[in-house]
C-alpha cells in the first residue's frame, strides 16, 4: 500500500480472507485444504512478483550499461561480447590486448572488409588477430594467414540464451619452450574437455559428423608452399599423424549470421597476420599455445595458401581417452612448425558436447630473440544466442568467470557481470518461504481460532475437554490439527531447529550468543517464529493432548505414517522445552553477573523479575501468554514435564509407537541433564584436584565387583536429586488442573490409565538418576585424564 486509501483496502482484503478461512476451518469438512490452497496461491503470487521485479531491475541495469557505452563513444565494427579491459603499450616482443566492441548487429565483420574471406565463414564467434599495432607503424601490405576452427552447432533453440565463457589465462612467455633453430617455433596444444557427460559419448558414436576445418581465407591467391608442423631436424615426418580440420557444409545453413565475434589484437614484429576464428558454440574446452618465430622470412607466408598440419600421434587418441574417462584429465599434444615442404592431413570428429561446457583458449607467443617476459590474464565472455537474441557488449571489466566446474559457485556480483543481458529464466516456485503476506494470513487465522479456544477456557460450567470432544466441534478440531501439522515443522526450523537449540543448551558456555549465530531461515525472524511457536503449542495443549480424537484419519489424509502426528507434537514440545531451558540459563547468568551476594529469596525473585524485564523474550511479549518459566533453577518447568507426559501417555494402548515416544522423551531428558548437572559438577573448574580425586573414587567403586555402596562422590548429588523428587511430584499433582496445557482433572485417569501419579514417575526418576550417574562418570574420567598436569601446577 502506497497511501492510506490502499492501506484501508488491504486491511479489508485481509479481513475477508480471515473470515473465509475461519469459516472453512470451523464449519467445512476438508476446510484445511482451503488454507493450504490459499497459502500456495499467495506464495506463488508473491514469489512471481518478486521474480518480475528482479527481471525489471536486471533489464534496467542492462539498458543503463548500454547507454553508458554509447556515451563513451566506443564503437567497433565487430559484433562481440568482450570482457577485455586491459590495454598495454608494449615495445618489441610485447603484447597488446585491444577491445573491439559491438554496437550494432548490422555492421559487417572486420574480417570481411579488411581481408578476403569466403562467405561460408559467417558463423565465426571469435577471431584472434596477430598484428604489429604496437609499433605504431602504417598498415603493412603483407597478406595474412587465416586459420578457422569450426565446431558443430548443437541444440540452438529460440528464446534461449546460453552463455559461454572464454578464458585466456596465464599468457606466458617462457624461454623453456624456445626452439634454437632460426626458423623453428613450438606450438603446444593443451586440450581439456570438462563437464562432458556420457550422452556425449553416445552422440559421438551415433550422430556426430562434425569436424574442425582449417581452410584458407585468401581464395583469390594461388596455391603456395604449405607450413608443416614437423621439425625435420628433431623428428621425422613419417611419425606424424594426419589431422585434418574440416567443416560440414550442411551445418552451415543452421549457423547464425549475427553471432558475436570477438577480436583480440596481439602485435608482432614481423608482417605476419594470423586470424584464428574459433566457433565455440559447442563449448569445447581447448587450450592452444602458439609460438611464431619472428625471424622467419615473410616471403614464405606472404600471398600464399597455408595449412597447418600436425605431428602428434597422441592427438588422435586424446579424444578417445578423454571420452572413455568422461574427460577427467588433461592431454597434451605438441606440434612443431618448420619449413613449408610437406603436406599431410588428419581428420577427427569432434564430440557433440553439451553447450554448457566451456572453451578456453590460451595462446603463448614466444619471441626467440627477446628475453623479456610478459604475462597477461585475459578473461573474455562470448555468448551463443538464438535468432531473437542480441549481441551485447560488456566493457571495462575483467570477469572472473566460472569455467563450468560445478563445484565453483558464482557470487551474485559475478553472475550479474557474466549475464549478457536480460535472461528469460524459467520461473520456478521456491519450496517454502515465509512471506509477509503468509505471516499476516496466519496471524489473523490463529487469532480467530484462539478466540474460540479462549471462550472454551472461560466457560463457567463446561470444561475444555467437553468442548474439544463434543461432536459439534469435531470439524473445528479436525481442521485445526491439520493446520497445525501443516506448519509446525517449518516453525521449528525457523526457531533454529531442535538440534542447534540442544547444542546451545548443552554447551558449557551456552548463551544467547549461540542462539544469535543460528541462521534465520525461510524469511521469518526468530522473534516472530518464537511467537508462532508458543501460539501453536497452546493450541496443541488443548486440541491434541486434551482430546480423545483418533489421529489415524488425519494421518491418512496427509499421507503420513502411523504416529506421525504425535511425533510432530513431540518435536514441538521438545523445541519449547529447550527454549525454556535456554531462557533459564540466561536468567541465571544475568543474576550471577549482577549480584553474587544476594541470598534472600525475595531479592532473588526481584532480581529474576528485573532480569526477565531486561531480557524481554519474544515468548513473554505474546499477548495473553505468560512466561512458562516459574522457577529458573529447575531443569524443566512444570508445563514442559506435563507436556512430555501427555505425549507419552496419550495413547492408552501399549504399542511400538508409544514405546518410541517414551524412549525419545528419555533421551531428550538425558541430553538436557548434561546442561543442568555440568554446572553443578564443574562450577568453573575451580577444584580440578578434588575433581580428579573424585574421579579416582568413582573408578574404584565402579571397578569393584563387590561394591554395593554408593560412591562417596554421589551423596550430595543424590541428595540434590532425590530430595526435590517428592516435592516435584506434589507440585505436579497440584498444578495439573491449572497448567497452560488445558489438561484437566478429568483427563488424568485416561492419561495415566488408572495408575497412580507417583508410580508413573518412578521410572522417570530412575532413568534420570542413571543418566546422571553415567554423565558424572564420563566427566570424572575426563577430569582424571587432565589431573596430572594440574596437580603438578
UniProtKB/Swiss-Prot annotation:
It comes from the Eukaryota. Keywords: Cytoplasm, Membrane. It is a peripheral membrane protein. It is found in: Cytoplasm; Membrane. InterPro entries: NBEA/BDCP_DUF4704. It holds the Pfam family DUF4704. Forebrain and cerebellum. The keyword Cytoplasm applies. GO terms for cellular component: cytoplasm; membrane. Residues 68-92, 685-793 are annotated as: Disordered. Residues 77-90, 689-710, 750-762, 782-793 have a biased composition (Polar residues). Belongs to the WD repeat neurobeachin family. Interacts with RII subunit of PKA. This is Neurobeachin. It comes from Gallus gallus. The gene is NBEA.
